[in-house]
Amino acid sequence: MAKGILGTKLGMTQIFNEAGEVVPVTVVAVEGNVVLQLKTVDTDGYEAVQLGFGDIKESRQNKPSKGHAAKANATPKRFIKEVRTSVEGYEIGQEIKADIFAAGELVDVTGTSKGKGFQGAIKRHGQSRGPMAHGSRYHRRPGSMGPVAPNRVFKGKLLPGQMGGERKTIQNLEVVKVDVERGLLLVKGAIPGARKSNVIIKSAVKGN
């Protein structure tokens, strides 16, 4: 059965495994997940568990958010997402902790990648630059726009533009360690987003 939890990326570090090898890990804080709503086939046409994470400060709360959270006896949450899974074993108001996952499990992590602003074709797409000798006037431009005949640039041409700031999912990352007391998950490798950004951790679609 698919599982999921919401969290905040704290940053990266490294730990040693049993073989004495260094393993790079990302630390994700997951303490404070609450089941706000259960979606069922009868009422919504599909099954899902709605999770809330991160409290909204009092001055930012509105009546709809207070009313929705009150049904779960919780405070309004800043980050609310659904996990498509069976609702069996879940109750409204239930707290989801880090031990929903175990060390060795594979997960998919979704987050918003770091925004890089407007970037050129070399940085954005990894293209090669032109000759840098003084005889050349072609250095970091995007290259040919295509053939003359269509009188237009084809869709998909790799050009300068906004880089980063997109929703990205990294698949099949291993859960290296689960710290229930401190509400932390240590995931092998890097995950999308800047420090203190919100992420969604779900059971791997392809791996498990």
UniProtKB/Swiss-Prot annotation:
Part of the 50S ribosomal subunit. Forms a cluster with proteins L14 and L19. GO terms for cellular component: cytosolic large ribosomal subunit. It comes from the Bacteria. Keywords: Ribonucleoprotein, Ribosomal protein, RNA-binding, rRNA-binding. The keyword Ribosomal protein applies. It comes from Exiguobacterium sp. (strain ATCC BAA-1283 / AT1b). Belongs to the universal ribosomal protein uL3 family. This is Large ribosomal subunit protein uL3. Pfam families: Ribosomal_L3. One of the primary rRNA binding proteins, it binds directly near the 3'-end of the 23S rRNA, where it nucleates assembly of the 50S subunit. Residues 117-149 are annotated as: Disordered. The keyword rRNA-binding applies. One of its GO terms (biological process) is translation. GO terms for molecular function: rRNA binding; structural constituent of ribosome. HAMAP family: Ribosomal_uL3_B (MF_01325_B).
